């Protein structure tokens, strides 16, 4: 761990199409091997698919709703106490909530069966906005783990 203190939070430039920092972060998390243009095509393609399927729904609002639904409130962290390792439930800070939600949505989308990544991502976002899908299962599993280990909450640091 660094002894130089906390580094300032780096800001992300808003995405060019919608002017949203959340979408820009989402694009950066979809990106693999530095291929940002491919990631932009995937995310914008997914938003187009969402707009086609739900003409009444705004794609940015749906993405935000999906992220809010998937974001975990608590998670477990390992803590060693006297030779035993305990899974200690801790609250998740807001920046980590969004990062975990994005990561889980993208991972769940990659595992889906649709034929193109924009369709996979759109389907996962729609499911998450309606409280179903793989990312929601992951959040429920995390909450269950925290609930099961509630007895060790006094080991928090």
Curated annotation (Swiss-Prot):
Complexes and interactors: Part of the 30S ribosomal subunit. Contacts proteins S9 and S11.
Record key words, sorted: Ribonucleoprotein, Ribosomal protein, RNA-binding, rRNA-binding, tRNA-binding
Residue ranges that the Swiss-Prot or TrEMBL entry lists as coiled coil: none
MF annotations from Gene Ontology: rRNA binding; structural constituent of ribosome; tRNA binding
Organism: Stenotrophomonas maltophilia (strain K279a)
PROSITE patterns linked: RIBOSOMAL_S7
Gene Ontology CC terms, in alphabetical order: small ribosomal subunit
Role description: One of the primary rRNA binding proteins, it binds directly to 16S rRNA where it nucleates assembly of the head domain of the 30S subunit. Is located at the subunit interface close to the decoding center, probably blocks exit of the E-site tRNA.
Name of this protein: Small ribosomal subunit protein uS7
Gene3D superfamilies documented for this protein: Ribosomal protein S7 domain
Family: Belongs to the universal ribosomal protein uS7 family.
InterPro entries xrefs: Ribosomal_uS7 (IPR000235), Ribosomal_uS7_bac/org-type (IPR005717), Ribosomal_uS7_CS (IPR020606), Ribosomal_uS7_dom (IPR023798), Ribosomal_uS7_dom_sf (IPR036823)
GO biological process, one term: translation
């Amino acid at each position: 761990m660094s002894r130089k203190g906390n580094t300032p939070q780096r800001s992300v430039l808003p995405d060019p199409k919608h002017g949203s920092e959340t979408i820009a972060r989402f694009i950066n998390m979809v990106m693999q091997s530095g291929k940002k243009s491919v990631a932009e095509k995937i995310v914008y393609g997914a938003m187009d698919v969402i707009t086609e399927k739900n003409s009444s729904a705004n794609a940015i609002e749906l993405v935000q709703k999906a992220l809010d639904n998937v974001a975990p409130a608590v998670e477990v962290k390992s803590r060693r106490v006297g030779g035993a390792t305990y899974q200690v439930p801790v609250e998740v800070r807001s920046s980590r909530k969004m990062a975990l939600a994005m990561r889980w949505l993208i991972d769940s989308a990659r595992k889906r069966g649709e034929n193109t990544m924009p369709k996979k991502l759109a389907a996962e976002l729609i499911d998450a906005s309606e409280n179903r899908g793989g990312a929601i299962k992951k959040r429920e599993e995390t909450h269950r783990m925290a609930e099961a280990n509630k007895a060790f909450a006094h080991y928090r640091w």
